[in-house]
Amino acid sequence: MTDRSSNEGVVLNKENYPFPRRNGSIHGEITDVKRRRLSERNGYGDKKGSSSKEKTSSFEDELAEYASQLDQDEIKSSKDQQWQRPALPAINPEKDDIYFQQIDSEEFTEGSVPSIRLFGVTDNGNSILVHVVGFLPYFYVKAPVGFRPEMLERFTQDLDATCNGGVIDHCIIEMKENLYGFQGNEKSPFIKIFTTNPRILSRARNVFERGEFNFEELFPVGVGVTTFESNTQYLLRFMIDCDVVGMNWIHLPASKYQFRYQNRVSNCQIEAWINYKDLISLPAEGQWSKMAPLRIMSFDIECAGRKGVFPDPSIDPVIQIASIVTQYGDSTPFVRNVFCVDTCSQIVGTQVYEFQNQAEMLSSWSKFVRDVDPDVLIGYNICNFDIPYLLDRAKSLRIHNFPLLGRIHNFFSVAKETTFSSKAYGTRESKTTSIPGRLQLDMLQVMQRDFKLRSYSLNAVCSQFLGEQKEDVHYSIITDLQNGTADSRRRLAIYCLKDAYLPQRLMDKLMCFVNYTEMARVTGVPFNFLLARGQQIKVISQLFRKALQHDLVVPNIRVNGTDEQYEGATVIEPIKGYYDTPIATLDFSSLYPSIMQAHNLCYTTLLDSNTAELLKLKQDVDYSVTPNGDYFVKPHVRKGLLPIILADLLNARKKAKADLKKETDPFKKAVLDGRQLALKVSANSVYGFTGATNGRLPCLAISSSVTSYGRQMIEKTKDVVEKRYRIENGYSHDAVVIYGDTDSVMVKFGVKTLPEAMKLGEEAANYVSDQFPNPIKLEFEKVYFPYLLISKKRYAGLFWTRTDTYDKMDSKGIETVRRDNCPLVSYVIDTALRKMLIDQDVEGAQLFTKKVISDLLQNKIDMSQLVITKALSKTDYAAKMAHVELAERMRKRDAGSAPAIGDRVAYVIIKGAQGDQFYMRSEDPIYVLENNIPIDAKYYLENQLSKPLLRIFEPILGEKASSLLHGDHTRTISMAAPSVGGIMKFAVKVETCLGCKAPIKKGKTALCENCLNRSAELYQRQVAQVNDLEVRFARLWTQCQRCQGSMHQDVICTSRDCPIFYMRIAEHKKLQQSVDLLKRFDEMSW
């Protein structure tokens, strides 16, 4: 139970985790400012806290609007009744079919019998669990020469004995082909070995791969035998063989399934079992592309910790939990509640539950989850913080039933530490918690995987995608709110409720759930694989499905990784410069997938010279030689499996896009758009799968052949365009390809107008496309005008797809889109480019740049513009790095606020002593502001701004571009006077005259004797300065009040991702110093 009589405990808001936090004061009102200095205009607000008459926040208005949409009788009725799922209609297993959308699946072994559990929801909203039985795991080995069918029974017995018994169920012979390498289209016998359960399949596999099985000398001892499809997860094997894909609909035919009345294991409304042979998987098309009425629950917790220490679930209590439950397809939540320790004033449109102690609250919330029975759990950082913390806290309090959060009786959820690592997403330490029957969609993980942002705090993400800031409350203030009154806890509850509501809004805005659903359907993997696994599993699933249809088996290749590399894509040397004529851009549509299709590149078509000679195949007739010397048979000999997969994906995408244009229902449109995007991503990932040297099935012959064809095509495109579009062929100018990169070329036709450039671009695309085999197609999509070409992979220009107006300013490789520099760089480069490209005012761009540099050197740039963020990706670095060293220093100051692996660390570069290494000069921005530590403006100019500025100005100004970094505008330099560190440790502060700065004795008046005759003038000047700073601070304060939704409460937000926050701290510091100076006049005798 929380001890509210003590002020020693402080509340830590989990939203700040895993983002850097530190102890510090909250910058609020300035006290002791006398009324003679216009204090009635300071606008700081009422300090008495919330009251019943206070204007409601904007979020409260939204809650009221939700409440108004509900029937009044429904509002007055018991909330518990609203939580329940719809009543189950009468179902006769002998006569009634059951259709449901399966959302979660797991493998389960009961005794020694394996089964699959499919959790789902029917079209009526009823929950269901289906036990699928009868499916056994298996793998293949190639039958050796001399192996006869009559040997099969003895082979099975001997193999089982070698595996120590109870492992092999039975074996059969099937005619298959090895997927890897062309062998003449002839099938050969393979032994299909079924094991009794998935956990011991590896035992049988190892017997073959280690050469431990000797059967009539056909499998020599000590010689390893390649196994096929022996490393496939049992659940995925079942889904592949039964054509089940993630999130699709399942049909249980009447009389084929049975209800499980005895020994029910779940709290689902329907529980049944069926043999896998009778289950019907429905393709995710037409009416079966719909979504069931899934229940989506978003939640957030607030927990209390000790001062300066991050909450420990074994000690620190959970004080509030907010939950919002929405049915998929509805815009209005049907459940909005907050579970609170201690009393809490009512919140409009929200059910508030008060509890005397924490154990009661946690136990009731766990029961609430089971009663409302959500299909999807969402939130922000719930996987790494909320769920594990709740479980550990309940364990500490010995609340036995709390971990029963899933749909299986007596299954206690436990959080486990995991490390996720992939080339695409990097390395992240995280936690996973099994909650059977419920999907977990952590919006923080979604953001980190799908978007490259400077910061992943909820506030930064909401600002980016929802266009609004979020109040971020410092944990020391949350302490006061919790230990205060029912009204103050109401404010905390609204804050908690909003943090539960925002992930739902983000999910809806970005269509994350529907996009991931379609990705699961397209690739065939379970939904939860999409966040927990990398890219390869998606291709593996598609490859195995198509291999099954063509009687191909996939070898289990042991890969230890290799340093072997292949040449990448071609980049045509750029003709750098500023182009004030239209530049047409020609792009190859789906270049790498189309190359694999056009040239039949696949595992199944890969040929070696010996096989070609043995089968008497003819070069250029039966097989082709790629530019890097690999052999692949032509389609009339064998159609490759990868080209078939790619053709199916791209054709399905065309169909989805065509259906999207005709569809009018917004939810169906969202599904179709998510589907076409998933199909595009899946097609593009096939090439990467073949080139992953540490992957499941690497084949550098395929990946290097693809890039070699790509290089050849780019060079050929350049040659064809420049030879055709010449003056001698009747055109007004000689065309020049000024740049080419991977799958596109930029062409200067020499014409002056957009319509002419677009016409020639369209014509050239069609002409070049005819030079290549189908389905390779060069498309004209856009014109850049004007165009700034800086270097390889660095350019900017106005993007035109129609002649009446430009679409956007587009840039690549320039600091406007990079996140490893401070925001000032992006702002300056973006503004300068807009002046040059949109306004075509190069002089204005120069003047703007000089003004920013001058402000930087005079310490006039806001701190928020100087913050650099870098990812902390591992614990050990070969070299000392600024963000790593700062993270360590922050850990020593306050271990609870230290960044964790995978977080982005925010820092600024400060002035250091001569000889200080760069990594020693990184510092926490808040610490810098609080202690007046001077920023190293020279570093920002020379290491952050200079190179990007020279890159964009040199193509226009040439050598004169360097004048931007030197001259009159750089001669005035000022910096803050530090209050800590360095020589200040030994300095003795001496008071000076406020008029002439002459030293005076401490405790004397504000002015020296020489300035006393100017006392009235100097006093008025100081009052004016205070008034000016009061107004500036009040404006920032008011802006923050508007953001928090209340003009009558103190601002308690400490969002490090908001520029207003840094401004408010800086102005507060200036105002406090100015007030202190003004107080010195009080000591004078007037």
UniProtKB/Swiss-Prot annotation:
PROSITE patterns: DNA_POLYMERASE_B. Its cofactor is [4Fe-4S] cluster. Residues 29-58 have a biased composition (Basic and acidic residues). A motif (CysB motif) lies at residues 1040-1058. Residues 1-64 are annotated as: Disordered. GO terms for molecular function: 3'-5'-DNA exonuclease activity; 4 iron, 4 sulfur cluster binding; DNA binding; DNA-directed DNA polymerase activity; nucleotide binding; zinc ion binding. Its EC number is 2.7.7.7, 3.1.11.-. NCBIfam families: pol2. This is DNA polymerase delta catalytic subunit. It comes from Schizosaccharomyces pombe (strain 972 / ATCC 24843). The lineage of its organism: Eukaryota, Fungi, Dikarya, Ascomycota, Taphrinomycotina. The gene is pol3.
